[in-house]
Amino acid sequence: MTQIKINGVSYDVKEGATILDTINQHDIPHPQICHVPAVDPIETCDTCIVEVNGQLVRSCSTKAVDGMDVYLTSDKAKAAQTEAMDRLLENHLLYCTVCDNNNGNCALHNTAELMEIEHQKYPYKPKVEPHEVDMSHPFYRYDPNQCIACGQCVEVCQNLQVNETLSLDWEAERPRVIWDTGVAINDSSCVSCGQCVTVCPCNALMEKSMLGEAGFMTGLKQDMLDPMIHLIKEVEPGYSGIFAVSEVEAAMRSKRTKKTKTVCTFCGVGCSFEVWTKGRKILKVQPSDGPVNAISTCVKGKFGWDFINSDERITKPLIRKNEEFVESSWDEALDLIASKLGGIQQQYGPGSVGFISSSKITNEENYLIQKMARQLFETNDVDNCSRYCQSPATDGLLRTVGMGGDAGTIQDIAKAGLVIIVGANPAEGHPVLATRVKRAHKLHGQKLIVADIRKHEMAERSDIFMRPKQGTDQVWLMAVTKYMIDQGWHDEAFIRENVLHFSDFTQVLEKYTLDYAQEMTGISKETLIQVAEMIRDADGTCVLWGMGVTQNTGGSYTSAAISNLLLATGNYRRPGAGAYPLRGHNNVQGACDMGTLPNLLPGYQKVTDDEARAKFEKAYGVPIQSQPGRNNMQMLDAIMEGKMKAMYLVGEDMALVDCNANHVDEVLSQLDFFVVQDCFLSRTAQYADVILPAAPSLEKEGTFTNTERRVQRLYQALPTLGESKADWEILQEVARRLGADWHYNHPSDIFDEMASLSPLFSQANYDVLEGWGSFCWGSHDGKDTPLLYEDGFNFPDKKARFALNDWVQPVEFEAQYDCLINNGRMLEHFHEGNLTNKSKGIQSKVPEIFVEVSPELAKERGIADGALLRLVSPYGALKLNALVTDRVQGNELFLPMNSVSKDSAINFLTGPAADVNTSTPAYKQTKVRVEVLKAKGKSPLPRTNPRYKKRHPQNGVEVQRKWNRPGYVHLTTTNERE
């Protein structure tokens, strides 16, 4: 064991640790203003300097070597640290008591106090005039006059988030942070992730929502505030007593500022963070210790919470009376629901009432929905929105490796030698996950292959970008697999020991030659060989895929083809490898885990399994149907056939997200009784007979499960708004009125019941999940399992199976429908935008919907930016403004999903075609004809949107440029980089 001495005391050192790592490991107080553990040493502040064997070195970048004698507070070290701090304070006013950042976590303030700074050696000099403080961005501001040029914001922007917008202008007379080439923040390539604001150690970068709100005296008008600042700044840096005053004020703030750990309610990455609130005001989101994201966020998680306090929230139960919604009491609404649903069940029997669950609500609430369906209505007719997106991926994995979840964690993706992204755009759909790929690719030599019909950010960054014809991914995947087997590049030992049906599989592959693949996909043979070589040479391959794969007629077969390729090359059962279907919603994984599926009970136990069913029958006190129920699509058919009379839908906008939305409108209108539980009057809710006001995630407790299979707790940050209630409380009230003996006092009671019935979760509970704790399901003994299949695949014989599927060709359209219309997420919005469209800041970046048109098609049809187009499919028509961009090519169009309008929402164009195995709609197989109604107009995307801007990559903060400044005097005696 390596040991070093610190101030004469011996300490153990972890392998590869720096001196500062060791100092922090043992909780020794030491200055370190520019230190960010998530990135490499920045080396800009010099406050961490220590003395080692008579030499002054930066502890953040100096490796701890056995036998080192380190002094933190020797005269030499202390003098260097103090000089470093004085250089920083020359750029900053310490007026802490009236500062918005005086919240106990200001690194500059805390370090000045730790170092017992009494006087400022160099007088403060402002860099710019007050009016030059950059207030242009909707979410945060930058004050150069408070910036100490530590570079943390630059380092995380360049090398952690890898958005590559920020840099430090070291050549300026007074160095400062700049955006792109020095433009206003709102005119830059900034994607509003907020990472720079999160790491800023002072008040140079601040959330606008904090300004004037955080402190007791920070909300004063400027003419009153300025004199106070001048008074404070005259005395505070030189008097430790005044620091004490500011700490008293900070302590007072903490009494009224509530800090609550939560889990993000948007995508499936599962970021967790603290949300700071004052009353109902959301002051800021502060990530720190999340097991998934650490200090990272995206624009939605950091700034997209305006919907919580939206005036559009439903706050009282609504009952349809005379074709109008009328506010009612909870008793009236619940009694009506119990009477109507109970009556329909009694009259028509099982199968007359269907249940649609939600990927937005908690695990506990999803569990109760399936329990209500099976216990009280004797039906397996329960489903969730995974049917619209991820069911094919789950199907492909269940048939090949036995479990329908990610093979490992996001850390495994970052470790992989090669990442292949197929039909997914994680930079916009799963932004924080994408940062880990971008960082590994930029800094650690990871290779990246992207297969997509649209050129998005990850495609631009890739080593190989392939644009296959729509719906042909299975062909190139099988061709690459065949080629690798033919070349002897497959992992024979792995296959022999772990996989069945290899001989049959090679026969299925026979026709998938490189020539055939080139003809069917449009990808050259040379490119496919390069892909095969890259897989061969990689130290671990991870494949990530999304709706560009799953939302096709052959989505489940293509998902299986991905798994087949990984099995053939031995890329399972080890870190840094495996299959990673990217779950779209915050809890779509959890909704499936909890059994809101027609064929599966909680914990993926089959309804056809007599033993599993008997267990639930004993717990629920009723027989469980032994045949799978209807899925979402089949329920709609049953409504049209008059077999299903009522539906209970929670937190889902079926009228927008289902395919062929015009048909869905007609179907929902046929229901005898329809209950919708939601926060907003969604399009689907407009068909309801009763609408129950539900609470969003910040107003309740429970758990979410992310794309890694990771379960995390969320805590209640705000009281419920008006008379709204948590979904689990509403469900319990309904169940009791229907005669159920439900007595849950807290979501933990529900979780414990679920875990007692589900072996995958048997060792999970709220104590395990307390605080920042988490649990990854994946083992039948219920233990935490970050990496799947270490003990074999999830079949009785522990062996995987090659799936034996041929390619399913895409749907054909009449010749008049000559343009393929693709669809997907935008970074700023989440899915249909029901939540994010409540944010003024987000709307300022993306104020309206549009359709992307290629330059080639624009030239051919005479289309310019802003042109008004009518898109007509066999199932409907939309009117949209055009955005001409090379992100699409030829006769391909792209329509963002974030619309709730019948004039612009994609599903008023999509048709009934579906995946062969799972009924998932083939949204991606939609063609239209384009009619030009107006040849040009105003661009639908503001010029302030970062998509117009160019990124400015560099290797972090580039501290050498600081050291090369004329007159710069080094404080260290040795430094390998100087």
Residue ranges of model-derived segments:
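Short beta-alpha connecting loops at secondary-structure transitions
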Residues: 5, 66-72, 179-182, 460-468, ...
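N-terminal cofactor/phosphate-binding cores enriched in small/glycine residues
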Residues: 11-66
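Fe-S ferredoxin-like electron-transfer domains
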Residues: 46-262
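Long, low-complexity segments enriched in small/aliphatic residues
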Residues: 582, 589-598, 749-841, 969-971
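Long, contiguous, secondary-structure-rich segments that constitute the structural scaffold
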Residues: 721-723, 727-772, 832, 836-852, ...
